[in-house]
């Protein structure tokens, strides 16, 4: 049999198409209880290409395309099935979220990609995001091919932690706005702050249990009081995942911001909210001097590894540049 990469054939799986959230959770509960693995598919812009590469495919896939309850959108509520382009075009969405959304991929992909899919985006690594034949040629990948006893190619001889990189855009902006994330399963619902949702492991990625999914995100009442900016490093402006991304958000005050938050993406296995660094800069605010100190502290706080296109040293240097660029609005009087 020819297994050439150019064939891009997905492995066989059973597709489930529930018409409601209740039905979706019933299906997921039955599969989870019987020990059968499955994936949720929303827009499919990340999952389906991964299936074509034979990256952790499952025997069952549950489509959320017909679950209308997950598509609600308002100033404080964003459903998991809201399309990314809807965030760009909606008048009810926070301006920072709209801007970040406009910088994700391309219009074509944003019309398919969803909020939940972006938040739950699989981590990436150039040893992982390759064809099955390529991975076999280097004796497999720890993240994808655990059953082979493969070693991690980024940090060899440890095989206790996958360091694949989280390269989605929405999470740092939502963190800076104080968003909460809401999950559901056949056993009930639970909620948490967005930073609590992520788990620093390139394989597990987050706290979702088998049979559980993201239903929506909510913003606090003071979200409209926050303004900010997002700056992103990538190879091509109209396509690529962030090699580094920085959100700086603040509440306006007299002569200085009254509150300040900074979050990053593309620099580790999870997006990070840098509250200590932001608080230190805010404690003795001196305008450009404080911005320079903030940018340097964020550079020191991140620790990227060699598993994306740009080398870690360059990405760390650019984090300082991106932080200063995202802070320019702080100097507008």
Predicted regions and their residues:
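C-terminal structural segment of proteins
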Residues: 3-333
């Amino acid at each position: 049999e020819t297994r050439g990469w150019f064939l891009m054939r997905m492995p066989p799986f059973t597709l489930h198409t529930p018409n409601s959230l209740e039905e979706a959770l019933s299906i997921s509960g039955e599969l989870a209880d019987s020990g059968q693995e499955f994936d949720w598919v929303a827009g499919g812009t990340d999952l389906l290409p991964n299936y074509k590469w034979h990256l952790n495919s499952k025997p069952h896939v549950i489509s959320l395309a017909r679950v209308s309850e997950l598509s609600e959108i308002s100033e404080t509520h964003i459903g998991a099935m809201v399309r990314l382009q809807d965030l760009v075009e909606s008048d009810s969405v926070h301006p920072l979220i709209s801007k970040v959304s406009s910088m994700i991929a391309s219009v074509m992909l944003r019309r398919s990609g969803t909020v939940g899919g972006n938040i739950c985006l699989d981590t990436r690594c150039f040893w992982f995001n390759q064809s099955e034949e390529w991975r076999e040629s280097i004796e497999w990948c720890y993240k994808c091919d655990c059953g082979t006893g493969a070693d991690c190619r980024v940090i060899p001889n440890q095989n206790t932690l996958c360091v694949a990189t989280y390269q989605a855009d929405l999470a740092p902006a939502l963190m800076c706005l104080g968003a909460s994330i809401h999950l559901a399963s056949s056993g009930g619902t639970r909620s948490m702050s967005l930073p609590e949702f992520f788990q620093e492991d390139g394989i597990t990625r987050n706290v979702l249990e088998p049979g559980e999914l993201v239903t929506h995100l909510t913003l606090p009442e003071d979200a409209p009081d926050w303004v900010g900016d997002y700056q992103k490093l990538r190879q091509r402006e109209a396509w690529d995942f962030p090699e580094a991304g920085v959100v700086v958000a603040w509440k306006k005050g007299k002569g200085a911001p009254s509150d300040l938050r900074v979050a990053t993406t593309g620099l580790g296995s999870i997006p990070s909210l840098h509250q200590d660094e932001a608080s230190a800069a805010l404690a003795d605010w001196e305008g450009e001097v404080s911005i320079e100190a903030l940018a340097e502290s964020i550079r020191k706080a991140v620790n990227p590894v060699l598993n994306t296109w740009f080398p870690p040293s360059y990405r760390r240097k650019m984090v300082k540049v991106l932080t200063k660029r995202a802070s320019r609005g702080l100097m507008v009087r």
